[in-house]
């Protein structure tokens, strides 16, 4: 059986290696490794080529973490702690996401990816969690991961992967405020949304933590399995 083909959104940033210091298409290797180890084939989607017709060649879409989403997308003024927006990245990833949802493709959103899912479903974000929860445990410092338990709703996709409680890493200062039409299926002890999904579709799941950082084979395995099922469905319908 051929491996399912999974598109992973990337972004443009400044990068340095050897003698070079230049703009580059960037994606953390952990996402590619997670897909490959679970039996999928990862395809990196360039940030400046987000025509939705590429989805016809894919069996799933993964939206990775990254910089804050432009608050204008959900009708808010920019908080002093919010990153400088990347309008092109926001627009491109939301275009891909909307098309993937319309096509019924499996979608996994990680950190920023969960937040994009919330916006696609009509939700909003909180721009700086310390203002809301009174601590910085979700992002102790730049490049330093926090760790905390997450409680998951029985019967959800997330609970099928982890059980009803798991401990996750954490590196975010923003979070879903209103999930829109998404169903919240995981929260931290302080109430912060940590997982959300669309139960009307086979696999649409966003998580606020980073499964690509320390290795999280269970989540990647569940996602790739859903993509493989989608691939088989497509092969059967084309006969």
PLM features: residue spans?
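Conserved G/P- and acidic residue-centered "switch" motifs that form tight phosphate/ATP-binding loops
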Residues: 111
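Active-site-proximal beta-strand elements of phosphoester/diester hydrolases
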Residues: 205-209
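N-terminal beta1-alpha1 cap of cysteine-dependent amidohydrolase-like domains
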Residues: 1-108, 119-121, 126, 130-159, ...
């Amino acid at each position: 059986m051929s491996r399912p083909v999974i598109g992973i959104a990337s972004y443009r940033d400044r990068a340095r290696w050897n003698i070079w210091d230049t703009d580059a298409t960037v994606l953390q290797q952990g996402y590619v490794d997670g897909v490959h180890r679970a039996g999928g084939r990862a395809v990196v989607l360039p940030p400046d080529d987000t025509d939705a017709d590429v989805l016809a060649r894919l069996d799933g879409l993964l939206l990775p973490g990254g910089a804050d989403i432009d608050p204008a997308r959900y009708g808010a003024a920019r908080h002093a702690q919010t990153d400088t927006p990347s309008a092109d990245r926001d627009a491109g990833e939301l275009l891909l996401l909307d098309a993937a949802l319309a096509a019924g493709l499996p979608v996994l959103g990680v950190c920023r990816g969960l937040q994009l899912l919330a916006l696609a479903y009509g939700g909003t974000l909180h721009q700086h969690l310390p203002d809301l929860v009174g601590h910085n445990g979700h992002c102790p410092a730049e490049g330093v991961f926090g760790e905390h338990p997450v409680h998951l709703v029985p019967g959800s996709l997330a609970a099928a992967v982890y059980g009803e409680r798991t401990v996750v890493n954490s590196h975010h200062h923003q979070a879903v405020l209103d999930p829109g039409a998404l169903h919240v299926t995981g929260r931290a002890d302080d109430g912060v949304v940590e997982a959300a999904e669309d139960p009307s579709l086979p696999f649409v799941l966003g998580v606020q933590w980073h499964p690509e950082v320390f290795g999280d084979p269970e989540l990647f395995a569940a996602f790739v399995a859903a993509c493989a099922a989608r691939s088989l469905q497509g092969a059967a319908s084309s006969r």
